[in-house]
Amino acid sequence: AEGIVEAYIHPGGRVGVLLEVNCETDFVAKTEGFQRFVKEIAMHVAAADPAPRFIDKGEVTQEFIEKEKDIARAQAIATGKPEAIVEKIVEGKMNSIYKDVCLLEQPFIMNPDLTVQQYLSSRIAEIGEKLSIRRFQKYVMGEGLEKRKDNFAEEVAAQMGQ
């Protein structure tokens, strides 16, 4: 497989994305149209809120699905809905969740009338070659770090008491 890995830094420098998109030939990988497409998808991943976690439904883990179904089921039961309706509510909620967490299901930021999948399909038709989004990772500065909670007054008092 040919293609490129795009490293995109969103303006302001707080968000970055690594994205791999494959094509069939190195000729296509070198074209401006393909490179622009890859950059646009990287920009989408950087700007999308909620941020995509998976490429498509097939990549969603069973653990994630079960957890989300349990949450949706508990919420539906808490409202007093009958059991027959609860499962339909859970199914609808899961479809909504897929639109949030699956990149190809999301509305494309640069043209919200299209999903990312529809935009990908239009680019495949235009370029005339199979393209596939292989993997991506979004990085947000400071994400996952625990912020220290210092109390300056207590710190000064502790030092004065020594």
Predicted regions and their residues:
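N-terminal assembly/interaction segments in proteins that build large macromolecular machines
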Residues: 1-162
